[in-house]
């Protein structure tokens, strides 16, 4: 009650000062009684529950205009598209950056120059499928996302640093209250290596989150990158189709794994370890040609799993890798039983001995490919 009385006293003072100054307050728009819930600036402020929401009439108008858009496809006006974009972006105080990421292609459609009110065949637009995906997203999620908690702060639990070079990316992660850390390294596909620096840095962020999936799931993550554009695009999206797709992959990963990520730029001088990881050349990463594999497979195949590979060198649909990479079944081939599989084995030289012992321990079968090296320590293991 003391708080209410104090607030009422402040309200009376302001009202009195306005009158003394010769100003007339608009009584229809003024609230002089303390309240914890009101609609202001197009937003519903609920200080009792500490939430911000978009008023239902605004939500209904957005859903209505989205429905009109779908009904009129493929012929719509830029006036209609602009109306949708404006309504979506106006949700940002309540839904956050998703309003920007999930409206980028609709925004780009606005620049598809045409008469303002003349029906336009949007199916001729390069990003028409993506525009339709964004419309469907807001039809499905507009109501679900319409709430923002006030005064809610969660301190980051996991710190991740990433970087990318011309041929690979790397990064490390650790809990804030622990000294132990984990790291990842991944070589790029030849096509990925041709991307610009923004594209490679975006891949580094995406691959790092996927690699540390078990570590970051359900956590608040602070991720550092030394590329300013990547830090912005990851959170807000891009008009570039390629970069926007990468931003969407990051967004979808976080949504599916309940990860709250804050991406921030830091100078390269503070990102030296991740930078050094991205420049590592893995000389143990070797493989055989497809022609050689096909020949061996014709004699002893088909092989069911490649135990030592990566996404760019795997010879089987199922494979294990040194670090996480796309489609990898696991990151430690020695942690599983090899029995019941026809194993394709092309291990790093320093793991050849362990591979032989693990194959025997599992009672498994497979083909082991090694360099012809009679003076090597592992060579004698074949003649026991």
Predicted regions and their residues:
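Catalytic palm active-site di-aspartate
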Residues: 1-5, 18, 30, 34-45, ...
